[in-house]
């Protein structure tokens, strides 16, 4: 890990004069690849002399102040470089000019262009295009502000890393201890840390006293890790003599030499990696882009065709250009941008009620199209609390209750051996409940002490009553705390039972070490010699519990004889003056971080929904595999290569990996794999567990899944997960246990840390995709009755049947609430029983949807509108045949004697009132046919009668659009404001037959689709 990596990422790349962008891009990619590699350092392998030579540090006096200042000037401060952030105004501009908005802007500009052409060439130009341009601009700006506000609630990634950086550090310089600002710590500094401190930089430990650090934010291991000067592992992340920047020292003290600072630390590399990753385009953004291409294509095709046609029909150039612009603008669905935004927002709110907080609106749908979930183990699939799972005493394994509400199995608590075992577990234990929690349930109480001891404390408190009282009865005299060399913990207590000797020695520790110190064993309360048979029984039990991925501890005791150890005897723990061999073995207790109750069911749902769940954890492979089996990630009956080898009793190398459906991959193996080998694993195994993985490997796994074409969701809670969260199509962070950093990198936060909430999210995401299709189908259909009047106006030269203002009243008025109401529609079938959609083939808007909306339903709607138009003009004396070619005279304000079919003469004002009445009636007809369209859009396959009319918002939408249409028609003053005139009641009914026709036509179509799945009708019309 060269000194320069990380830091030079932010310095401008050396680029030639021509500004060779390729070079810059290549350099950035190289840097990112460099960061993705495993941490490479050798400081943990060096002896103290070699360290002294490498860093020039006196191991007792530290650096001199002058030397420290030189290094500080060379390396810069010990701080993380903030990433280049996107300014707020650019984010706002993205909302204003991104995707769909661009289409509306082009429409608005074209409107202003058309208006300026008219203003320049006509004496009294009509203001329609001006109004339209203003309205389009307003729609984009309002919707843009709304989306920006929705997303501005989430903030930037790096600031949370800053909260993790320690403020002060204790260094030794010139032989004196001094507290300095952590930013001034330099490579080679001698640093001291104690329990409660944050580690100020990456340190090579040179001396330690009972030091333990919490690496969970970095490696995901929930247990505190011991730190000592010993070199214990080739991998720097696993060895005991390196402590990492910004992890916490939990207990003890240590002294170390700084080997890396700032961006060059392991944490700094992760920070740089997370901020340097480009998040790809969300699936829904890609869908909307595809949709815009289709709409633009249709608009331009129609516009250009009619432009050429109008020139053939001998219109002037200027008129033809205005027609061209009018047609393109008429194709733009003005209300759709707002509809999509509101639908996504509603779903986001609905998900928040179900404990999924969505930060990025488009991520709502991404979760629905997810095909692979890479889940962290600790805290997501498990409860993140060590719990006693099994005991072995009286030569049999007993199961403890690990459920969250203690509703599980229980065991025989009356055995004398169990009483002895629980006594050791309670006494030889330094964990205590924190104060004032008596009224809380035992499992919910906070404990001071390490995870395993807390588990024992809670278990004994549940089974045997107050541990505090037990400890008061058996007063502690002396203890030897646990350390890594002898691997046991021992204490001696006063024994209140007068029938027994007055001193009781209790010990717990690594099972094999404890057994070595015992010569007898307690069976059913009686002490018996420990023979080979019993030793084998112990070995089998130990292997079985260990194979379940559980952490096993052994327990033994000894009553110290009164004649050697009378009352008041001075026990000495340094120069041990009491027996620590020939003890009596009592039993084993094993602990595990148990799966959450709802997870197996959730994993099952994912499987039936076609989603592959992969476990990626920093934990031990055996534990990972046990939990994977417990939650169903590895299902019953599926074997790994190791299982097959064990069953057939052959070496692993002889098993064909393709025979195993499941596989457990160790991080160290992953390190040596090529991307092709990883691809093979992901392709040929359905159930995969990655164990002992590093943060960089998580990222490589996510990229591997994406290479397979999967849409990947990643869950995580540690800092170590942030690069993977950022790279995934959707990152899901934990709300309770998650570090700030992971929450910043994610798109979604699980407020209850429960994997099961993801499944709810998937369901909501799939539903919104279906419902957006319905919404778009509904909205697009009214485009045809809006465009055709304009086209017929050009071709047949008839008076304009529908005006611009009325089109806006439909798109931004009557159609809005019904379109949004479809977001509340319930799923037609079990959406969690089908495969995830394929983003390449299953589009939001496909040719079939366009053909249904434009070609079939839209055409029937247009017929309904024209029927009403011809009825009104005929009632006023203009028969349809008489209208052909009438446009030029009709629109000429200087001609006041246009004759109708019966010879009556009409002035310009009178003609226009009839024309605007037709506009109003055409508008009302569209509302009437949209009733049927709304009802048929409720379902894509089922009959409306199967689905029912339970959607109250949709029923409200039907009434709302009708009321709005009536208001616009009958409200006094509308004739002046919007040029809309009152209609005769009978004119409302002209479109009813067409509305009924749409309903019947679509019900028949869906019936055929249900009767003949995969047939011609489904292939051509099922969107």
Curated annotation (Swiss-Prot):
UniProt PTM: Phosphorylation on Tyr-10 modulates pumping activity. Phosphorylation of Ser-943 by PKA modulates the response of ATP1A1 to PKC. Dephosphorylation by protein phosphatase 2A (PP2A) following increases in intracellular sodium, leading to increase catalytic activity.
- Taxonomically, the superkingdom here is Eukaryota
The reaction(s) annotated as catalysed by this protein in its Swiss-Prot or TrEMBL entry are: K(+)(out) + Na(+)(in) + ATP + H2O = K(+)(in) + Na(+)(out) + ADP + phosphate + H(+)
| Record's keyword terms, sorted | Acetylation, ATP-binding, Cell membrane, Cell projection, Charcot-Marie-Tooth disease, Epilepsy, Intellectual disability, Ion transport, Magnesium, Membrane, Metal-binding, Neurodegeneration, Neuropathy, Nucleotide-binding, Phosphoprotein, Potassium, Potassium transport, Primary hypomagnesemia, Sodium, Sodium transport, Sodium/potassium transport, Translocase, Transmembrane, Transmembrane helix, Transport
Where can this protein be found?
A: Cell membrane; Basolateral cell membrane; Cell membrane, Sarcolemma; Cell projection, Axon
Classify the protein's membrane topology as the record does: Multi-pass membrane protein
Effect on the protein upon substituting residue 601 to F: In CMT2DD; uncertain significance; requires 2 nucleotide substitutions
Residue ranges listed under propeptide: 1-5
Annotated catalytic residues: 376
Extract the GO molecular function terms from the UniProt entry: ATP binding; ATP hydrolysis activity; P-type sodium:potassium-exchanging transporter activity; phosphatase activity; potassium ion binding; protein heterodimerization activity; protein-folding chaperone binding; sodium ion binding
UniProt xrefs under PROSITE patterns? ATPASE_E1_E2
Q: Does the keyword S-adenosyl-L-methionine apply?
A: no
Q: Which residues carry this modification: Phosphoserine?
A: 16, 40, 47, 228, 452, 484, 668, 675, 943
Provide Extracellular-side residue ranges: 109-131, 309-320, 793-802, 867-918, 971-985
* Residue spans, topological domain Cytoplasmic: 6-87, 153-288, 339-772, 824-843, 939-951, 1007-1023
Looking up InterPro entries in the UniProt record yields:
ATPase_P-typ_cation-transptr_C, ATPase_P-typ_cation-transptr_N, ATPase_P-typ_cyto_dom_N, ATPase_P-typ_P_site, ATPase_P-typ_TM_dom_sf, ATPase_P-typ_transduc_dom_A_sf, Cation_transp_ATPase_P-type, HAD-like_sf
Q: EC number(s)?
A: 7.2.2.13
User: Function, please?
Assistant: This is the catalytic component of the active enzyme, which catalyzes the hydrolysis of ATP coupled with the exchange of sodium and potassium ions across the plasma membrane. This action creates the electrochemical gradient of sodium and potassium ions, providing the energy for active transport of various nutrients. Could also be part of an osmosensory signaling pathway that senses body-fluid sodium levels and controls salt intake behavior as well as voluntary water intake to regulate sodium homeostasis.
Q: Which disease is it linked to?
A: Charcot-Marie-Tooth disease, axonal, type 2DD: A dominant axonal form of Charcot-Marie-Tooth disease, a disorder of the peripheral nervous system, characterized by progressive weakness and atrophy, initially of the peroneal muscles and later of the distal muscles of the arms. Charcot-Marie-Tooth disease is classified in two main groups on the basis of electrophysiologic properties and histopathology: primary peripheral demyelinating neuropathies (designated CMT1 when they are dominantly inherited) and primary peripheral axonal neuropathies (CMT2). Hypomagnesemia, seizures, and impaired intellectual development 2: An autosomal dominant disease characterized by generalized seizures in infancy, severe hypomagnesemia, and renal magnesium wasting. Seizures persist despite magnesium supplementation and are associated with significant intellectual disability.
Write the protein's name: Sodium/potassium-transporting ATPase subunit alpha-1
What organism does the record attribute this protein to? Homo sapiens
């Amino acid at each position: 890990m060269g000194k320069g990596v990380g830091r030079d990422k932010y310095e401008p790349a050396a680029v030639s004069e021509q500004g060779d962008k390729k070079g810059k891009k290549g350099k950035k990619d190289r840097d990112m690849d460099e960061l993705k590699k495993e941490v490479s350092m050798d400081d943990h392998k060096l002896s103290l002399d070699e360290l002294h030579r490498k860093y020039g540090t006196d191991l007792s006096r530290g650096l001199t102040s002058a030397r420290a200042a030189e290094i500080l000037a060379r390396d810069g401060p010990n701080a993380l470089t903030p990433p280049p952030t996107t300014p707020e105004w650019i984010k706002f501009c993205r909302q204003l000019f991104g995707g769909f908005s661009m289409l509306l802007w082009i429409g608005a500009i074209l409107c202003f262009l058309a208006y300026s052409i008219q203003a320049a060439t006509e004496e009294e130009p009509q203001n329609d295009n001006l109004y339209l341009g203003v309205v389009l601009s307003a729609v984009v700006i309002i919707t843009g502000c709304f989306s920006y506000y929705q997303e501005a609630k989430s903030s930037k990634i790096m600031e949370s890393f800053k909260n993790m950086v320690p403020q002060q550090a204790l260094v030794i310089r010139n032989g004196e201890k001094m507290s300095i600002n952590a930013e001034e710590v330099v490579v080679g500094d001698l640093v001291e840390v104690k329990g409660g401190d944050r580690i100020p930089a990456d340190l090579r430990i040179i001396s330690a006293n009972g030091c333990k650090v919490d690496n969970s934010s970095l490696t995901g291991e929930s247990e505190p890790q011991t730190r000592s000067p010993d070199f214990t592992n080739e991998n720097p992340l696993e060895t005991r003599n390196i402590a990492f920047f910004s992890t916490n020292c939990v207990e003890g003290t240590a002294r170390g030499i700084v080997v890396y600072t700032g961006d060059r630390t392991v944490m700094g590399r992760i920070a740089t990696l997370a901020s340097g990753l480009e998040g790809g385009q969300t699936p829904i953004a890609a869908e909307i882009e595809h949709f815009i291409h289709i709409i633009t294509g249709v608009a331009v095709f129609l516009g250009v065709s009619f432009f050429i046609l109008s020139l053939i029909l001998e219109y002037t150039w200027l008129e033809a250009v205005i027609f061209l612009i009018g047609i393109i603008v008429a194709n733009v669905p003005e209300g759709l941008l707002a509809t999509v935004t509101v639908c996504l927002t509603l779903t986001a709110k609905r998900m928040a009620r179900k404990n999924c907080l969505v930060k990025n609106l488009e991520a709502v749908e991404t979760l629905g199209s997810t095909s692979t979930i890479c889940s962290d183990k600790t805290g997501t699939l498990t409860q993140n609390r060590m719990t006693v799972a099994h005991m072995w005493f009286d030569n049999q394994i007993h199961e403890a209750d690990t459920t969250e509400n203690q509703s599980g199995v229980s065991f025989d608590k009356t055995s004398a051996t169990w009483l002895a075992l629980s006594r050791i577990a309670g006494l030889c234990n330094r964990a205590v409940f924190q104060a004032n929690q008596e009224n809380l349930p035992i499992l919910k109480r906070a404990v001071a002490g390490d995870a395993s001891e807390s588990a024992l404390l809670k278990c004994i408190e549940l089974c045997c009553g107050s541990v505090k009282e037990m400890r008061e009865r058996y007063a502690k005299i002396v203890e030897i705390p646990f350390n890594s060399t002898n691997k046991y913990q021992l204490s001696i207590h006063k024994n209140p039972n007068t029938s027994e000797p007055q001193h009781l020695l209790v010990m717990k520790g690594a099972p094999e070490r404890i057994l070595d110190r015992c010569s007898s064993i307690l069976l059913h309360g009686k002490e018996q010699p420990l023979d080979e048979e019993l030793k084998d029984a112990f070995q089998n039990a130990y292997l079985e519990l260990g194979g379940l991925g559980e952490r096993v501890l052994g327990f033994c005791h000894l009553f110290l004889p009164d004649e050697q150890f009378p009352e008041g005897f001075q026990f000495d723990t340094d120069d041990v003056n009491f027996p620590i061999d020939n003890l009596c073995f009592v039993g084993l207790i094993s602990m595990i971080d148990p799966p959450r109750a709802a997870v197996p069911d959730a994993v099952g749902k994912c499987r039936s929904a076609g989603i592959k769940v992969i476990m990626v954890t920093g934990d031990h492979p055996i534990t990972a595999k046990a939990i994977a089996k417990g939650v169903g990630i590895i299902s019953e009956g599926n074997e790994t290569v190791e299982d097959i080898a064990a069953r057939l009793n052959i070496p692993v190398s002889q098993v064909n990996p393709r025979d195993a459906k499941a596989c457990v991959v160790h991080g160290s193996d992953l390190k040596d794999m090529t991307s092709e080998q990883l691809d093979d694993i992901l392709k040929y195994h359905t159930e995969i567990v990655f164990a002992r993985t590093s943060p960089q490997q998580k990222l490589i796994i996510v990229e591997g899944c994406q290479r397979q074409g999967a849409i990947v969701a990643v869950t995580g809670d540690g800092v170590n997960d942030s690069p993977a969260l950022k790279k995934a199509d959707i990152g899901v962070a934990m709300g309770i246990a998650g570090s700030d950093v992971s929450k910043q990198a994610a798109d979604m936060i699980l407020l209850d840390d429960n994997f099961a909430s993801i499944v709810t999210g998937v369901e909501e995401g799939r539903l919104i995709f279906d419902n957006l299709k319905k919404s778009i189908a509904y909205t697009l259909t009214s485009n045809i009755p809006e465009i055709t009047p304009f086209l017929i106006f050009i071709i047949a030269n008839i008076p304009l049947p529908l005006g611009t203002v009325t089109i806006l009243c439909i798109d931004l008025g009557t159609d809005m609430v019904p379109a949004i109401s479809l977001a509340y529609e319930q799923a037609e079938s079990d959406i969690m029983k089908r495969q995830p959609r394929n983003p390449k083939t299953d589009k939001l808007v496909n040719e079939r949807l366009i053909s249904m909306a434009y070609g079939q339903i839209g055409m029937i709607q247009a017929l309904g509108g024209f029927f009403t138009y011809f009825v009104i003009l005929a009632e006023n004396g203009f028969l349809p045949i008489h209208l052909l070619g009438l446009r030029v005279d009709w629109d000429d304000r200087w001609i006041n004697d246009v004759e109708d079919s019966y010879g009556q003469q009409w002035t310009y004002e009178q003609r226009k009132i009839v024309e605007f009445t037709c506009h109003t009636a055409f508008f009302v007809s569209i509302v009437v046919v949209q009733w049927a369209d709304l009802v048929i859009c409720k379902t894509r396959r089922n009959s409306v009668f199967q689905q029912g009319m339970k959607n109250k918002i949709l029923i409200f939408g039907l009434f709302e659009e009708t009321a709005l249409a009536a208001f616009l028609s009958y409200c006094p003053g509308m004739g002046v404001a919007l040029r809309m005139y009152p209609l005769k009641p009978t004119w409302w009914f002209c479109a009813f037959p067409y509305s009924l026709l749409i309903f019947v036509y679509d019900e028949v179509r869906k019936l055929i689709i249900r009767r003949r799945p995969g047939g011609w009708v489904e292939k051509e019309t099922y969107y």
